[in-house]
Amino acid sequence: MKTKSWRKQAPRTNPERRISYMKCGRKCFLQPGTLAFPICPKKSCKISCQGLRAAYARARQTKRPKVARLALIKACHAKCTWTRRRGYCERIH
């Protein structure tokens, strides 16, 4: 999966993630308690399809099926193109 451009946008360090959490709230993380799996860019509170794709890939790599499923559900609601091409949304609903 291509997520290179997300690498530049993602809040990577813990202080960046805390600022993003205080500014945007729980919606920008798939695991807000630990500030894991950010899905919004640093300077925006809008959910990014690239962030959802990166979170989905990382959750699959680390064997976290609940997080991967949550990323897919949010991506389907956001109408991300990568979910429609592979037919993920039909399998979820």
PLM feature spans:
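Extended terminal accessory/targeting regions
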Residues: 1-93
